[in-house]
Amino acid sequence: MEPESILDFHTEQEEILAARARSVSRENQISLAIVLVGSEDRREIKEGIEILEDVVSDTAHSEDSRVCVHYLALAHARLKNYDKSINLLNALLRTEPSNMQATELRRAVEKKMKREGLLGLGLLGGAVAVVGGLVIAGLAFRK
């Protein structure tokens, strides 16, 4: 799997509806949160974040906590909260330095940040060039 494709997964609406229909249990809440993180709807991703944060704050189960932190980082990355995502992954990697999933996700998030940052600079540069061209054209028209 291409590292960046980690960020591009999505959940079908049927999966979300099925997860919502399950009885309320810790395991089902985690499953629901995970499918919500894969939603195309930002509100559902945010709902997934809320569920995961509740589970993490209430957990004595380190495995559940690890999974939840991983999906929290993924959710924040999907919402373009890259700094929050990187901070969560760094915290996870401090406790589990050999966690390859977290390492790959951090690499994908950093790559996406870099590309979008460069893209943002390119768009800004293009906008400056257009405005500069309009100013020059306006000055030339005046003469």
UniProtKB/Swiss-Prot annotation:
InterPro entries attached to this UniProt entry: Fis1 (IPR016543), Fis1_cytosol (IPR033745), Fis1_TPR_C (IPR028061), Fis1_TPR_N (IPR028058), TPR-like_helical_dom_sf (IPR011990)
One GO BP annotation of this record: apoptotic process
Transmembrane segments: 121-141
GO CC annotations, alphabetized: mitochondrial outer membrane; peroxisomal membrane
Subcellular location: Mitochondrion outer membrane; Peroxisome membrane
Disruption phenotype: Mitochondrial connectivity appears normal, also normal in a fis-2 mutant background. Modest but consistent increase in the number and size of clusters of protein lgg-1, perhaps representing abnormal autophagosomes, in a fis-2 mutant background. RNAi-mediated knockdown inhibits removal of ultraviolet C radiation-induced mitochondrial DNA damage.
Topological type in the membrane: Single-pass membrane protein
Similarity comment: Belongs to the FIS1 family.
Protein's UniProt name: FIS1-related protein fis-1
